[in-house]
């Protein structure tokens, strides 16, 4: 019921819940903003911002502010550029409920780290999630024993380099090239090797672009094999086509890799007070 004696109060009561459009100041505020969006049904996928019935909606990065329309607009104090570039690929490709839960877990870790995310997270993620996933996918396929052993050995060689960097060591460019070429069939091994052998932050940003692209290719290749029933028995829901099955498997793979990234963030030490 309206209150003619207090129109301002009535207006406040009927105003739609919406997202603030001002830019968040730090990673803790970013977590609070994302949680607010989640709790009030203001998150969307595959679009940066959207207005609906007077409400401002946004994606996992768009919630940071109305001016955030791409990874390059993400403030550095929230997360590094290389991580911002990865977020849409995970958030937009998971099932909605999985994406929303993943985003909350991501921002929780960013708040804990105060936005100071070391690049070692990528080495951790590659060694413990991406390459582990790919090794498992290879083992489910119909390779002859010798071919499978060769492929798994190549995965282990590359994983050892990631672990070496994670533990504070370093490997020369040639070592990265030799390990990457047989594994990263979908990425530019030379460019990735240059970045991994270089301590420059901009090179690292480029390296991550290749790392994510290849992780996505692995997820897609595994989904293809799954949909073709080449690797294992593949139950389909009633009326589900091969394309449907592949899309479902791809979303599951992306979730697995995205969860692995959050787990790697959780293992990164918090900055000193």
Regions found by a protein language model. Give the residues of each.
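Short, glycine-biased loop/turn motifs at secondary-structure junctions and
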Residues: 1-273
């Amino acid at each position: 019921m309206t209150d003619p004696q207090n129109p301002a109060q009535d207006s406040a009561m009927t105003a739609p819940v919406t997202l603030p459009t001002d830019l968040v100041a730090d990673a803790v505020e970013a977590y609070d903003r994302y949680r607010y969006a989640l709790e009030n049904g203001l998150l969307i996928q595959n679009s940066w911002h959207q207005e609906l019935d007077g409400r401002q909606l946004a994606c996992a990065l768009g919630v940071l502010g109305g001016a955030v329309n791409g990874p390059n607009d993400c403030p550095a104090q929230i997360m590094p550029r290389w991580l911002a570039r990865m977020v849409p690929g995970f958030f937009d490709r998971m099932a909605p409920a999985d994406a929303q839960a993943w985003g909350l877990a991501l921002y929780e870790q960013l708040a804990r780290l105060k936005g100071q995310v070391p690049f070692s997270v990528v080495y951790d993620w590659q060694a413990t999630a991406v390459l582990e996933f790919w090794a498992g996918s290879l083992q489910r396929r119909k390779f002859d024993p010798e071919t499978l052993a060769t492929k798994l050995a190549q995965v282990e060689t590359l994983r050892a380099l990631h672990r070496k960097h994670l533990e504070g060591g370093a490997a020369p460019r040639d070592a990265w090239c030799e390990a990457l070429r047989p594994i990263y069939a979908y990425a530019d091994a030379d460019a990735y090797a240059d970045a991994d052998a270089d301590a420059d932050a901009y090179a690292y940003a480029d390296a991550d672009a290749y790392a994510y692209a290849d992780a996505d290719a692995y997820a897609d290749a595994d989904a293809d094999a799954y949909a073709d029933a080449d690797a294992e028995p593949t139950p389909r829901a009633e009326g589900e086509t091969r394309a449907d099955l592949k899309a479902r498997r791809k979303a599951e793979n992306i979730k697995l890799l995205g969860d692995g990234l959050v787990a790697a963030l959780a293992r990164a030490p918090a900055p000193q007070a």
